[in-house]
Amino acid sequence: MSFPILTVIALLPFVGGVITMMLRGAAARATGMVFSLVTLVLGVYAFIVGVNGTNLSETHRWIRAVGAWYALGGDGLSLTMILLVVILVPVVLLAEWHVGDDETARWSTGAFFGLALMLEGLAIYCFAATDVLLFYLMFEATLIPMYFLIAGWGGPRRGRAAMKFLLYSLAGGLVMLFAVIGVGVHGGSFLLSDLAKVDFSGTIGKELFVGFFIAFAIKAPMVPVHT
């Protein structure tokens, strides 16, 4: 497919998020919901054509110095996860329709809806990325909207919870960064299609596995590294 459907699906919530954060009240709710529903329609379309064999891959040179690519793609698993994301976000927005009416909230309805849309875009990038470095950057970028969502609409100790979440996640991200660098150095590429041909058996494979496992265990979070 020549049309960059995955890029559009990922960027549309960002555009919607920026616009929604400038609005308040009913206008913010309506705008956020419209963008989430349009993203839902495009996500369902991408899922249908993707699982029926259409090639949705997008590959462009990105950071030449390190051999990184702006590469997106979709197989049965990643498209299913993207479909789940685009379905869940409108449900979340409906469930929190009156979030701005809560006197305990720190920011407006537009801020909540905008952050939720931005988080949706980053999640879609994570599931569509076929370049390890691109995945890492999008995965870590989710910390930004997550931090503000927790700090703005969390429980009574939300400030402390948000900071604790951020610090734990950054620690896990640092471990993952070393693993990502190791993959790039050993594999000579960050593209999954190239890395699939590389032999990661032996000590290097075990070390990289441990690095990614620790990072994802913290992100999950899994016992005993949960907060």
Spell out what each predicted region is.
Residues 18-22, 94-108, 147-156, 182, ...:
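Helix-loop junctions at the membrane interface of multi-pass solute transporters
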Residues 16, 20, 39-42, 92, ...:
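Alpha-helical transmembrane segments of multipass membrane proteins
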Residues 51-69, 174-227:
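Juxtamembrane/interfacial segments at transmembrane-helix boundaries in multi-pass membrane proteins
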Residues 9-13, 28, 32-35, 39-42, ...:
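Small-residue packing motifs within transmembrane alpha-helices
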Residues 1-12, 76-85, 132-145, 202-218:
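Structural signature of hydrophobic alpha-helical transmembrane segments
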Residues 1-5, 19-114, 189-197:
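Transmembrane helix-loop-helix hairpins at membrane boundaries of multipass inner-membrane proteins
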Residues 8-25, 221:
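N-terminal signal-anchor/start-transfer transmembrane helix
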Residues 111-118, 122-205:
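Alpha-helical multi-pass transmembrane bundles of energy-transducing inner-membrane proteins
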